[in-house]
Structure formats: C-alpha cells, structure tokens
C-alpha cells in the first residue's frame, strides 16, 4: 500500500473518531440537560403549600409575635389554618402529657422543654429567641418605685409563680442580686402579672421586657440589672403531630428571617444573645436603677437568623 493511501485511511479513521466523540458529547450534554430539567421540575413540585389545621402550644409571652407570624404563614399557605393555645409553659407541657393533641410546642425556657423531651413528647428543639426581666409600674409610677430595693416596701408587688419560667427567672435574679421579695400574688402566666399592673390592682410587677413593650403606654418600665439571667425560648414539633408538614412550615417561619424580624420588633433578643429588650412600648422611669438591660432595636432585626442555634436541653 502506498504511503499516500495509508495517510488517507488514517485521516478517515481520525475523522470517524472525532465524529463519534462529538456525538457522545452531545448525548452527554442532552442527558445532563434532561437531568437538570427533571431536578428543576422536582424542586418546583417540592414547593407545594401546606394545608390543614396546625395547633401550636406557646408560652403566653409569645402571643403578639406569634399571631403576627401566623398572618404571614397563612397568607403564604392559603389552605393552612393555625390555632394557638397561649398558657404558662408548664401548663402546656402538662397538656401534652395528658394526651391533648398539638403539632408544635414553644416554651419560655429550656427546663420546661426538657420536661417535654424527657417524656418523649417532642422531637428536636431549636432555640429561636431570648428574653430578660424588667419591673413595671402603673403609668405615672404613683408609688415612686425605683427598683428592686427598699422602694418596694409596702408596695403591692406581683410576680410569676416559681414553677413558671418567668417565676423561675425571677428567683434566679433575686438570688443573684441578694434581694428578698414579698409579693402579694404569684401568677401562673406572665400576662396575668402585666394585667394586674395595667389595671392598677398591683403597684409593681416583674415581667419580661416583651410584656412591658406589649403594655405600651399603660405602664412605666423600670430597668433592673439582668445579672446574666436570660430565658432561652425553644420550639419543637410534637412527637405525634397530626399535621407534620404544617408544623414544619410554622417552625421554619419562626426561625427564619421574617419570623426573627417580627420577634425582634416585639422586644425578643436573638437566639443565644445575653440580653433582650423592648424596642418600643412602655417608657422607662427616670428613677430606674443602674445597669439596665440592653434594648433590642429594629436595627437588630436582620441578625437573629445568623445566630439561630439548636437549644440545649439543660436549664439556662
């Protein structure tokens, strides 16, 4: 065979190889495109909206914020109906333990959530907010109370009961400050403490900073040292939810950017933060004590999501 003919055959063979490679590459690209399209279609299908009823058991201090988050969630999921039971955290755990049905549990401290976890009533918990205590008095501060000291002598002070998260925090705070209180009443819900001060039935009450904000111009707020006493708020899906998909949607909303912004507006601190406070609402009395709790301003609202963390099951 001549050199010219061998060269021609070699050239033809090379062209055939290149042609096959090109076809293979085209087929591969086509396959990749199809897979990508299928993945896109699958992702789109996975974005289905939650429907049905979701029952949320939540600490009383969360009422305003959670009801606002509810509106956004239901607007985004037209077929979803969220209902709440706002009570003291210990009562919520007892309700679950007694067999009452619910999809989500949100408590005002880790110790009550731990009780639920120990009884296998909930799944994984996620911390979504923090809160600290403050002192409130009726508008105008008629008793001229200045803090947790002698100015409370003879005053009708109302606190939360020791078994309630705000009462547990109050006990820790007074122990840290070396202060002895003599409340005339101990309530099962922090909102009941606030209500008695708003109505003038009590001269002073120890509540969360978020409750002081919720009271708006009905009370004056007297800042007190928090002494590192911070309540950490965890949320969890119950162990036997009737609407797991709906529960997940609500929990994601609470821990997500929008929910965290709402919580910050209501005075809650970011998850894991050492301080929390009200950005609006009750005014601080001029006679307030030194070392006040830091307020959570609207400028913080973009940061809580970055600080989101899974709650430890030990008490704060």
Which residues does each predicted region cover?
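Exported/periplasmic ABC-transporter solute-binding proteins
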Residues: 2, 16, 24-62, 67-71, ...
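A generic structural motif
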Residues: 77-84
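Short, high-confidence coil segments that cap the C-terminus of an alpha-helix
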Residues: 79, 101-102, 202
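PIN/NYN-family metal-dependent endoribonuclease catalytic core
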Residues: 132
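Sec-dependent bacterial lipoprotein signal peptides
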Residues: 1-21
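Ligand-binding clamshell of periplasmic/extracellular solute-binding protein-like
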Residues: 86-93, 101-116, 122
């Amino acid at each position: 065979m001549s050199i010219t003919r061998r060269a021609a055959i070699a050239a033809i063979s090379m062209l055939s190889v290149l042609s096959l490679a090109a076809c293979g590459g085209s087929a591969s690209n086509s396959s990749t495109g199809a897979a990508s399209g299928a993945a896109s279609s699958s992702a789109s299908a996975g974005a289905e909206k939650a429907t049905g009823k979701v029952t949320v058991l939540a600490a009383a201090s969360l009422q305003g914020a959670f009801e606002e988050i509810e509106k956004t969630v239901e607007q985004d999921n037209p077929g979803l109906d969220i209902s709440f039971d706002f009570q003291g955290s210990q009562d919520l755990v007892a309700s679950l333990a007694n067999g009452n049905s619910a999809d989500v549990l949100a408590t005002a401290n880790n110790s009550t959530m731990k009780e639920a976890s120990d009884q296998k009533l909930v799944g994984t918990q996620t911390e979504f907010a923090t809160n600290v205590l403050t002192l409130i008095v009726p508008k105008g501060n008629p008793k001229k109370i200045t803090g947790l000291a002698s100015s409370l002598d003879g005053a009708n002070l109302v606190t939360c009961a020791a078994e309630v998260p705000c009462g547990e925090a109050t006990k820790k705070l007074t122990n840290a400050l070396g202060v002895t209180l003599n409340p005339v009443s101990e309530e099962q819900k922090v909102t009941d403490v606030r209500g008695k001060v708003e109505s003038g039935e009590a001269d002073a009450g120890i509540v969360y900073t978020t409750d002081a904000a919720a009271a708006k111009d009905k009370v004056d707020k007297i800042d007190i040292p928090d002494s590192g006493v911070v309540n950490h708020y965890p949320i969890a899906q119950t162990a036997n939810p009737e609407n797991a998909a709906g529960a997940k949607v609500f929990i994601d909303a609470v821990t997500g950017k929008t929910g965290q912004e709402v919580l910050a507006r209501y005075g809650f601190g970011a998850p894991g933060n050492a301080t929390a406070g009200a950005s609006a609402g009750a005014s601080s009395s001029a006679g307030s004590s030194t070392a006040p709790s830091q307020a959570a301003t609207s400028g913080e609202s973009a940061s809580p999501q970055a600080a989101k963390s899974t709650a430890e099951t030990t008490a704060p």
